[in-house]
C-alpha cells in the first residue's frame, strides 16, 4: 500500500530532530531546472504568481537563491519533519519510532511542486512552490506539464519495490492532478472525510486536512497492508459510513460536537 499526501506551506527547521537518518531526493536534476526558472522571478513577480504578501515573496526569492544541489543535514532536513501544516498536525511524525520511520519510508510519499516525489526521510531545503502555480518552464506552461509522467513513473517504482498495487490517495486534488491514474499500476482508494455542520455532512477543509494526517498515522501505527482495513479508522470521532461509500471512495463521517 502506498499513501500519497500533499506538502505544507508552513515549514519547521528549528524543532529538535527525532531521527538522524536521512535519504536524498531522487529527482533533484528536475528540481534544479525549476530553481533555475524560479530564480528569474523578482519578488513582485513571485508575489503575483503565488498570491502571497511582499514579505513572503522576499523570503521565497531568498530561498530560491540560497538553494543548492548538495543536500546535507546542515542545510536541509527530512521532509516529513520539515512540513508543518494541518495534515502533518494529524500525522505527528515527530512522535514516530525508528520502526515507524522504516514503515513510512516504504509506504508513504509526499507530492511536491519542486521535488516531484519525496520519501519521508528525504532531505529537503526550504521552498514554496505549489503544484498549481503557472510557472513557465522549458517543458510547458505549468508544473503539471513540467512533471509529465515523471511523478507517476516514480510512484510505479515504489509500488513495484513493495510488490503491491494499491494507492491510498490522501493528497489534495491540486497535487493528485500531477499523477496520471491511467498510467499508475494501482487501484486507487480515496478516503473522504465529512464533518457535520448544522445537521449536514460536508467537507470542512481544516478538519479534512487533519483527518488525512490522522488516517496516514492510523495506517502507519497499525502497519496496514489491505485497503479494507482502513474502514476501522475511528480517530477523533470519525466513523466509516458504508452506505455513502462506493468503489474507490471510502467515506468517513463525524458528528458535530454539541
Swiss-Prot record:
Superkingdom: Bacteria
GO cellular component: cytosol
UniProt xrefs under Pfam families: H2O2_YaaD
GO biological process entries: response to hydroperoxide
InterPro entries for the chain: YaaA
NCBIfam families hit by this protein: PRK02101.1-1, PRK02101.1-3
Similarity comment: family membership: Belongs to the UPF0246 family.
Name the record gives this protein: UPF0246 protein YaaA
Amino acid at each position: 500500500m502506498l499513501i500519497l499526501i500533499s506538502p505544507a506551506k508552513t515549514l519547521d527547521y528549528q524543532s529538535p530532530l527525532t531521527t538522524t537518518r536521512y535519504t536524498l531526493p531522487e529527482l533533484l536534476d528536475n528540481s534544479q531546472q525549476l530553481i533555475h526558472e524560479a530564480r528569474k522571478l523578482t519578488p513582485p513577480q513571485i508575489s503575483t504568481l503565488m498570491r502571497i504578501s511582499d514579505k513572503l515573496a522576499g523570503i521565497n526569492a531568498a530561498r530560491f537563491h540560497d538553494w543548492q544541489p548538495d543536500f546535507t543535514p546542515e542545510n536541509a532536513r527530512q521532509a516529513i519533519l520539515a512540513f508543518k501544516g494541518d495534515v502533518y498536525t494529524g500525522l505527528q511524525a515527530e512522535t514516530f519510532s525508528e520502526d515507524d520511520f522504516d514503515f513510512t519510508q516504504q509506504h508513504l510519499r509526499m507530492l511536491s511542486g519542486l521535488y516531484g516525489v519525496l520519501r519521508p526521510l528525504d532531505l529537503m531545503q526550504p521552498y514554496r512552490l505549489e503544484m498549481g502555480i503557472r510557472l513557465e518552464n522549458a517543458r510547458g506552461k505549468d508544473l503539471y506539464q513540467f512533471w509529465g509522467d515523471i511523478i507517476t513513473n516514480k510512484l510505479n517504482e515504489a509500488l513495484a519495490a513493495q510488490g503491491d498495487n494499491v494507492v491510498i490517495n490522501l493528497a489534495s486534488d491540486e497535487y493528485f492532478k500531477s499523477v496520471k491514474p491511467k498510467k499508475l499500476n494501482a487501484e486507487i482508494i480515496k478516503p473522504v472525510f465529512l464533518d457535520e455542520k448544522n445537521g449536514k455532512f460536508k467537507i470542512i477543509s481544516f478538519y479534512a486536512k487533519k483527518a488525512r494526517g490522522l488516517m496516514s498515522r492510523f495506517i502507519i501505527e497499525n502497519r496496514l497492508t489491505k485497503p479494507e482495513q482502513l474502514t476501522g479508522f475511528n480517530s477523533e470521532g470519525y466513523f466509516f459510513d458504508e452506505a455513502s461509500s462506493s468503489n474507490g471512495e471510502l467515506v468517513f463521517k463525524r458528528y458535530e460536537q454539541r
